[in-house]
Amino acid sequence: MAAELSMGPELPTSPLAMEYVNDFDLLKFDVKKEPLGRAERPGRPCTRLQPAGSVSSTPLSTPCSSVPSSPSFSPTEQKTHLEDLYWMASNYQQMNPEALNLTPEDAVEALIGSHPVPQPLQSFDSFRGAHHHHHHHHPHPHHAYPGAGVAHDELGPHAHPHHHHHHQASPPPSSAASPAQQLPTSHPGPGPHATASATAAGGNGSVEDRFSDDQLVSMSVRELNRHLRGFTKDEVIRLKQKRRTLKNRGYAQSCRYKRVQQKHHLENEKTQLIQQVEQLKQEVSRLARERDAYKVKCEKLANSGFREAGSTSDSPSSPEFFL
């Protein structure tokens, strides 16, 4: 084990460090394999020895060239903020760079607070929250981004002078960012049951006003049942009773309208028939008068003919001569 540690030129060789490392069983830790391109990326040399009172979330057996050590907490040591930013950006790439599609520069910009946290970084928050929940033995709880508040307060005026007044007027970034960081873990979204109950609660007072009278009458029973899902039984019964009342009222109005229309039609036919009867009566009267006139004329002709036949029976001018 000592031979393996001596092979790494970047590891410390002091007796205190060797004694501190030998206290751990290095065989039980898994070494994460990294691609060759990522291993060639320049990294921060591990020349600083962690004190005995510090707590680290990264095993010491991990190569320093591939995964930098996580920031440690020590009451007697003030670590630099650039190291915290570098650790977070490098640790982000080691976790899952393909899933987040985010560069280390974006993570640094998000820590400084020059623009809102993008959506991929919020998923990183949930991962960090789960990671810190696993390491619950840390003496002080901290946010998803270690050193974010310090970097925002101290590095902000030097890196961005034109945002100095904005940083002074704004509340502390740790307290302002805590609701947004705790949102994915402590405030989960409503489930399907909560959504259905919220829909039913929103329509409790206006279940009868939700559908108009025309919609209730024209809607089929199956479609109405589909729209009434989530409401209470009393509301459904009351709405269906209203639908039946409207249907009965509409049926009665339809029957009344048909009766009125039929009555008007019969009255019109009656008027037309009365007019035709009057016309026929007038025609009968006219024909009766003509008949009487022809009858009188016929009687006159018959009487005059008999008189002439009796007086001049031999006269060739008599009508009977031609007969």
From Swiss-Prot:
Residues 129-143, 159-168 have a biased composition (Basic residues). SUPFAM superfamilies: A DNA-binding domain in eukaryotic transcription factors, Leucine zipper domain. Phosphorylated by GSK3 and MAPK13 on serine and threonine residues. One of its GO terms (cellular component) is nucleus. Residues 34-78, 116-210 are annotated as: Disordered. Pfam families: bZIP_Maf, Maf_N. Residues 266-287 are annotated as: Leucine-zipper. Ubiquitous. Keywords: Activator, Disease variant, DNA-binding, Isopeptide bond, Nucleus, Proto-oncogene, Repressor, Transcription, Transcription regulation, Tumor suppressor, Ubl conjugation. There is a cross-link at residues 32, 297 (Glycyl lysine isopeptide (Lys-Gly) (interchain with G-Cter in SUMO)). Residues 238-301 form the bZIP domain. Residues 54-76, 192-201 have a biased composition (Low complexity). Residues 238-263 are annotated as: Basic motif. Residues 34-43 have a biased composition (Basic and acidic residues). It comes from the Eukaryota. Belongs to the bZIP family. Maf subfamily. The leucine-zipper domain is involved in the interaction with LRPICD. Acts as a transcriptional activator or repressor. Plays a pivotal role in regulating lineage-specific hematopoiesis by repressing ETS1-mediated transcription of erythroid-specific genes in myeloid cells. Required for monocytic, macrophage, osteoclast, podocyte and islet beta cell differentiation. Involved in renal tubule survival and F4/80 maturation. Activates the insulin and glucagon promoters. Together with PAX6, transactivates weakly the glucagon gene promoter through the G1 element. SUMO modification controls its transcriptional activity and ability to specify macrophage fate. This is Transcription factor MafB.
